[in-house]
Amino acid sequence: MKNLLDLSIEELKELVSPSFRATQIYEWVYKKNATEFSQMLNLPKDMRQDLAEKFYLDPLKCVKFEQSSDGSIKYLFELKDGLKIESVLLPMKEEISDEDGKISRHARYTICVSSQVGCKMGCAFCLTAKGGLVRNLTAGEIVGQILWIKRENKIPYERRINVVYMGMGEPLDNLTNVSKAIKILALNEGLAISPRRQTVSTSGLGSQIKKLGEMDLGVLLAISLHAVTNELRSRLMPINKAYNIEAVMDAVRGFPIDMRKRVMFEYLVIKDLNDSVSDAKKLVKLLHGIKAKVNLIYFNPHEGSEFGRPELASMLKFQEYLRDHGVTCTIRQSKGLDISAACGQLKQRNENPKFRANVSGNSAAKTEEKPTNDKTNVSKK
């Protein structure tokens, strides 16, 4: 059997007749939360039976989740072959003014998805990298993470969703399937998540950044930089030996970006390693001529890590220097500090009960095993 979520609507149209049935199937799956073909009552019975014999709609199963006191939820999913991946739901808030200028608050969500089982980039600060790469996810397995999280949390179809490819794996090391997932998510017949609300994060595969740009998908780009010298970056991120900082910056300068948007540079701040004002000065020079936004990220400690979480004062000084020199800079609001927030932590805890994430305030967090026979709500829309 094949995963129907792997199919674009054009591919599905080639498999069903008449072709308008493909649109109906897409609407059931992406807009009405159907998880079984038997729920698609406007399809002929024989077609439903035929589809059920050839395809499945549930590429993953949630085996555990942890909910933080800040509302973020980390999920551990099991794939059909028994391998496990992680995804995260980050509830946000945005302010919207009505016609009278009165501000009302509306929830919005960011979903962080994995693109691979494991990762071969070998970043020193990343728990996922310690296990190496097992395999790429298919487009349907990537899309399935978003579908499951939206369905489980009863997020309305119309509600704004941002997708970030920042979970387990290097997205550009699985560019074929990631680019297909981007296109499937953007289809109006499906979830209609615009590419401009999808961000691909990379450790800096220069040649793949170029390929992604040539695809002209309209997605946003985020670069995991984390250091301002090649010596330190090579220590933290072995990929720097193949694509050094200069090569990454050259690739970024050639990447097509919406004039209203900026390239995001993610900078993981590690105590006494890359958190000085001197580092900030070097970063300003590196970003010269690039329409950039820097996102400072607190290092999330985990058991066995040699690195420490930076002080708030260091973060603020770093941010202040960048802003004073014309670089847009934010400090990422730390979410999930009371759960296994760092990439790979929940998977590691599930597989190794002796492992403990170095987190605080665990009494506020909620951890649950998910039953395997969850009933899924199907929208009546």
Swiss-Prot record:
User: What cofactor does its activity depend on?
Assistant: [4Fe-4S] cluster
> What is one Pfam family matched by this protein?
Radical_SAM
Identify the enzyme class.
transferase
Protein keywords: 4Fe-4S, Cytoplasm, Disulfide bond, Iron, Iron-sulfur, Metal-binding, Methyltransferase, rRNA processing, S-adenosyl-L-methionine, Transferase, tRNA processing
Q: Where does [4Fe-4S] cluster bind?
A: 119, 123, 126
The EC number of this protein is 2.1.1.192
Show the active-site residues: 86, 343
Q: List the disulfide bonds.
A: 112-343
Cofactor note from UniProt? Binds 1 [4Fe-4S] cluster. The cluster is coordinated with 3 cysteines and an exchangeable S-adenosyl-L-methionine.
Primary subcellular site in the record, as a coarse category: cytoplasm
Q: Which residues form the Radical SAM core domain?
A: 105-338
The segment annotated Disordered runs over 351-381
The Swiss-Prot or TrEMBL record annotates one GO molecular function as: metal ion binding
Q: Which GO terms describe its biological process?
A: rRNA base methylation; tRNA methylation
InterPro entries reported in the protein's UniProt record: Aldolase_TIM, Methyltransferase_A, RlmN_N, RNA_MTrfase_RlmN, rRNA_lsu_MTrfase_RlmN/Cfr, rSAM
Q: Which HAMAP family match?
A: RNA_methyltr_RlmN
Q: What else is known?
A: Reaction proceeds by a ping-pong mechanism involving intermediate methylation of a conserved cysteine residue.
State the family named in the UniProt similarity comment for this chain. Belongs to the radical SAM superfamily. RlmN family.
Role noted for this protein: Specifically methylates position 2 of adenine 2503 in 23S rRNA and position 2 of adenine 37 in tRNAs. m2A2503 modification seems to play a crucial role in the proofreading step occurring at the peptidyl transferase center and thus would serve to optimize ribosomal fidelity.
The protein's name = Dual-specificity RNA methyltransferase RlmN
Source organism per UniProt? Campylobacter concisus (strain 13826)
